[in-house]
C-alpha cells in the first residue's frame, strides 16, 4: 500500500461511517484496541484505559483523527502499524455498557473476539504495574464483563493497567472514580508510554504469525 494509504482510509471512513460503509479490508491483519472507561470522567483512575488510547493515538500519529460514530456510540480512529491496521476505539457509553460499543464496532469491521484488545484499569495491581491477560474471566471489572456479554466470548486479550487498591473496601468506589493524585500524575507519562509499547509489541508479534502467545 502506498505511504499514507491507511491515513487516507481513515479520512474517508470519517465520512462513510455514518452510512456504515467501510473501507475495503487492508491486505494485512486488522486489530481493534478499545480503551474502557467513562466518557464523562476522562481523568479518573477508572478511565485510565482511555488515557492509554490517547497515548497510542499520539504515538501512531492519529491523535487528531478521532471521529465520533453514532452507530457504535464511540470515538474511532484508524492507524497503520506496518502491514496491519489498528482500529482505535473509545466508547461513549458508561463503563457498564462499554461492551455495546465494542461489539458493534467489531461487527462493523469484521473482527473476532481474539482480534479485539481491551485496555482497562486493574485494582489488584499497584500503580505502574502492567499485565497482558489472554482472555478469561472479567475478574470483577464491569467494563470487561459488559464486553464479554456483548461479544459472547471471553477470548479478548486485555492490557490490565494497575491503579492500586485502597486499604479500606468501602473506599473502592471513590478510589476508582477519583482523579490521580499529584504524585501519581507524575508517574502517568511513563506508565502510558510503557503500556503503549507493550500493546504495540504484542500486536506486531501476532501480526507476523497465527499464534496468540505473549
Swiss-Prot record:
TRNA binds at residues 96, 142. Keywords: Hydrolase, RNA-binding, tRNA-binding. InterPro entries: Pept_tRNA_hydro, Pept_tRNA_hydro_CS, Pept_tRNA_hydro_sf. The active site is at residue 46. Gene3D superfamilies: Peptidyl-tRNA hydrolase. Its EC number is 3.1.1.29. It holds the Pfam family Pept_tRNA_hydro. It catalyses: an N-acyl-L-alpha-aminoacyl-tRNA + H2O = an N-acyl-L-amino acid + a tRNA + H(+). GO terms for molecular function: peptidyl-tRNA hydrolase activity; RNA binding; tRNA binding. One of its GO terms (cellular component) is mitochondrion. PROSITE patterns: PEPT_TRNA_HYDROL_2 (PS01196). One of its GO terms (biological process) is rescue of stalled ribosome. Belongs to the PTH family. NCBIfam families: pth. Peptidyl-tRNA hydrolase that cleaves nascent chains-tRNAs that are not stably fixed in the P-site of 60S ribosome-nascent chain complexes. Acts downstream of the ribosome-associated quality control (RQC) pathway to release non-ubiquitinated nascent chains from 60S and 80S ribosome-nascent chain complexes. Does not act on ubiquitinated nascent chains, which are cleaved by ANKZF1 for degradation. This is Peptidyl-tRNA hydrolase. It comes from Homo sapiens.
